[in-house]
């Protein structure tokens, strides 16, 4: 009997091992691992690419692709886009410094797009702000085909250059930063539409949405952003942590958000400016607006500035904030709690509440003469709305696939185990 029990124990042990190894099915993001775990969840399957010091050697970023790279503390790195003469192209660069690094107030990432003749198509930069807390930040570049833009209209190679804004600034450490790059294209419209931004919209500051808060845990990156829709959402956030949420906003709809940071009973006193930073990014991960919420241990809140409804013609606006609201899709809310909060009030966690309002009925958008890349990035689907209501990303069946793989492996091994047990039992009876 002892022999039979030992054999079964070995089989069940092997079953447990097989199950444990079968469950994690998500791919690991490409690129070398750093000594300190990254605070950012890179896209599964992101392709590793090394930026070139010269545009002559710049690696290609294919439209619709996601890439992982790195940015040295000094100098520029370049990448190439091969574009046609009719599509708008966008590239987002998310810079991820190590949590152990230090940054200056104005340090950040700068993204420039130029054509093969050296003409500048766009420039954008994002900084860490007064809290000087290292965290993932994103800047975007673009090549637009627009009646008001005479440059960068030719087909051919265009170059994306990425650099630090203030690598030598006081308090900035010389560490290299990880990068996530996403290249996108937006097709031209089938019909000629307005060539000026809408002149009138409701710019009154809306009242924060009321109601009981529902728990919704934030994601750790753009691709893993937790879907939410209109509502009051709460999560816990720790100093140095960054949380990502995705809100579907359709054509004609207007988003407004208030962020609240709850009080603490630590008894400590002090003040951290812009302790909670909330940034709204558009579907191309372009910066739309942000708000900083200071913290003295008591509850405090802040709201994004009033924003116009999403409209294709917003791209013709003179202000970058309005121009960024140029397409429908998932708008990202990225919340970061400054590391400095821990110095005064401890490691937390601290309760964070997001009051999200999406006003207006969805309207018909422009008729595009083709598909965007990635497909569907500039639209809101029924699946997107369902995902926002349920809090699970559309098409995210990772957990189910893990369960299926684990279940099949476990079931098969158990059947084998029971079969062996039966054989051993019969042999024992025969003896």
Regions from the PLM with identified roles:
Residues 1-11, 397-409, 424-425:
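N-terminal export and membrane-targeting signals
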Residues 87-89, 146-169, 253-255, 322-340:
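Noncatalytic modules at the cell exterior or secretory-pathway interfaces
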Residues 245-401:
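Membrane-proximal extracellular "stem/stalk" segments
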Residues 405-431:
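C-terminal membrane-anchoring or membrane-association module
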């Amino acid at each position: 009997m002892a022999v039979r029990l030992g054999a079964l124990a070995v089989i069940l042990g092997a079953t447990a091992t097989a199950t444990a190894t079968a469950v994690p099915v998500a791919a690991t993001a490409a690129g070398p691992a750093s000594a300190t775990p990254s605070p950012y969840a890179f896209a599964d399957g992101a392709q590793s690419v090394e930026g070139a010091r010269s545009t002559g050697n710049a690696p290609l970023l294919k439209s619709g692709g996601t890439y992982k790279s790195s940015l040295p503390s000094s100098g520029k790195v370049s990448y190439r886009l091969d574009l046609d003469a009719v599509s708008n192209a966008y590239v987002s660069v998310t810079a991820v410094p190590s949590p152990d690094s230090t940054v200056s107030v104005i340090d950040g990432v700068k993204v420039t797009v130029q054509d093969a003749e050296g003409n500048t198509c766009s420039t954008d930069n994002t900084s860490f702000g007064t809290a000087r807390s290292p965290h993932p930040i994103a800047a975007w570049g673009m090549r637009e085909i627009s009646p008001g833009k005479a440059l960068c209209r030719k087909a051919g190679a265009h170059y994306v250059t990425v650099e630090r804004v203030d690598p030598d600034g006081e308090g900035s450490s010389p560490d290299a930063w990880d990068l996530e790059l996403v290249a996108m294209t937006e097709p031209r419209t089938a019909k000629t539409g307005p060539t000026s931004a809408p002149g009138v919209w409701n710019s009154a500051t809306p009242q924060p949405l009321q109601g009981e808060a529902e728990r919704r845990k934030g994601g750790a990156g753009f691709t893993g952003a937790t879907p939410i829709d209109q509502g009051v959402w709460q999560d816990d956030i720790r100093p140095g942590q960054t949380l990502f949420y995705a809100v579907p906003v359709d054509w004609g709809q207007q988003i407004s958000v208030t962020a609240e940071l709850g009080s603490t009973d630590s008894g400590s006193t002090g003040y951290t400016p812009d302790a909670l930073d909330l940034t709204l990014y558009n579907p191309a991960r372009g910066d739309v607006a942000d708000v900083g919420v200071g913290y003295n241990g008591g509850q405090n809140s802040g709201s994004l500035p009033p924003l116009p409804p999403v409209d294709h013609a917003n791209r013709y606006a003179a202000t970058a904030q309005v121009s960024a609201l140029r397409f429908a899709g998932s708008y990202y809310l990225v919340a970061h709690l400054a590391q400095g909060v821990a110095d005064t009030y401890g490691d937390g966690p601290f309760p964070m509440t997001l009051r999200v309002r999406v006003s207006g009925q969805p309207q018909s958008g422009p008729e595009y003469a083709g598909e965007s890349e990635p497909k569907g990035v500039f639209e809101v689907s029924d699946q997107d709305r369902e995902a926002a209501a349920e809090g699970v990303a559309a098409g995210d069946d990772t957990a189910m696939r893990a369960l299926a793989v684990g279940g099949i492996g476990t079931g098969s091994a158990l059947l084998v185990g029971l079969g062996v047990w039966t054989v051993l039992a019969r042999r024992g009876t025969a003896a």
